[in-house]
Amino acid sequence: MTMEPADSLCQRIVESSPDAIIFSDQDGIIRLWNAGAEAIFGYTAEEAVGMTLDIIVPETIRERHWEGYYRVMKTGVTKYGKDMLSVPGIRKDGSRVSLEFSVALIRDEDGVLLGVSAVLRDVTVRWRKERELKERIAALEGPAKKPGSPS
């Protein structure tokens, strides 16, 4: 078995990941959109590349998103570091998706900030199951009795 060059191998990993891998430049324009992003959000790479991140950020949180995004582009620092973040997203068909993601600042050889990469995972089904489980537990426990209340 012959190993491929690292660049080719990295490209194959990005292309075949079931997670969305997205790169956006300093202006928030999508420059990379893999097959995982296509599956999660419903946009093909041809549709998404060249568009802003607004296509996946719900309108209700866009202002806050862009404030943070441009602050990071200006300062070159993200307060989230290696944290796993949770946010709602929006699909092409308008439906909501629950996402967990991490971000990395991407710089060129001279250290100039090029933009941000994000790896996103659809956790909608897991969150729905967790909510259903909590509702079942609450129903089984019944109304909580307060100390000193009549039985």
For the regions a language model picked out, list residue spans one by one:
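PAS-family sensory domains
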Residues: 8-16, 39, 77-78, 112-122, 135, ...
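PAS/LOV-family and closely related PAS-like sensory domains
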Residues: 36, 45-49, 54-100, 107-109, ...
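Short hydrophobic secondary-structure edge segments in sensory/regulatory modules of signaling proteins
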Residues: 21-22
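PAS/LOV sensory domain surfaces, especially short acidic/polar patches at coil-to-helix junctions
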Residues: 27, 31-39, 51
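Sensory-domain boundary capping and coupling elements
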Residues: 101-103, 120
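C-terminal helix caps at helix-to-loop junctions of PAS-family sensory domains
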Residues: 16-17, 147
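Sensory-domain boundary/capping and coupling elements
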Residues: 4-8, 127-145
